[in-house]
Every structure is written in C-alpha cells, then in structure tokens.
Amino acid sequence: MNKIKDAIYMPGGYVYNVHYHLIWVTKYRKPIFVTDEKRQVMKNLLTKIANLNEITIQEIEVMNDHIHLLVSFPPRLSITNVVKAFKGASARLWFQQFPETKQLLWGGHLWSRSYYAGTVGNMSQEVVRKYIQGQRSCK
C-alpha cells in the first residue's frame, strides 16, 4: 500500500488526513496576550491540552486577542468537542496563572462563544470532484 503524505495511520486499520484551521477570539476581543511571556504561556497551555486529547498541533499562533491553530485529530473526535476542550481547559488554567485577567472581562469568560473551523487539504474541492467523477469510467 502506498503511504499518503501527511496521513496519520492508526493501529485499528484506518487512515485519516484531515486538518483544520481553528480560530477563536477573546471575549469582547480584549487584548489579553500582550507580552511574549503571555503568548508563550498560552501556547504551552494549548500544547498541553492537545497532548492530553490526541490532537496534533501543526502550527500555532497566539495573537493579542485571538488564536490560530492548524490541527489534526482522530475522526472519532468532533470539531465542537475539540474546540470545547481547548477553550474550556485553557481558560481555567489561564485564570489560575493570571487571575487578574478576570477583571478585564465582564462575566469572567476568557473566550467568546464563537469560533471558526475550516478544513485544509492538499487537494482542492475541484480536484476531488473530478477524481470522483472519473471513477465512473473505471468500472
């Protein structure tokens, strides 16, 4: 069997090659991660959470008021649960280290409720569509 570039092979016999670009913002887009130290602390927290949840972080960037992640995780995990794990645990751990942050945020929430999730692939939708359509002639 030819190996698929960037695919993750599981002992159970399935292969997945799905990558997600995740973005979420701080509550009210407040600039919370304003120093290199704070950005690094958040990167470390997110990396720890990923390791505990079988999530592979391929790229990470912490901006003043939002997070960018390029991640991959087993198909049995849902995007919603992955984001919930990141946001929930990171907020709890962040407030333990920086309790003064709560005063900057009404209601004491670090993150807004919303997030963006987009799939990222090495083939465009059009390439996949043409490949599938081409399978008809291979019968």
Q: Language-model segments: which ranges?
A:
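Basic nucleic-acid-binding interfaces
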Residues: 1-139
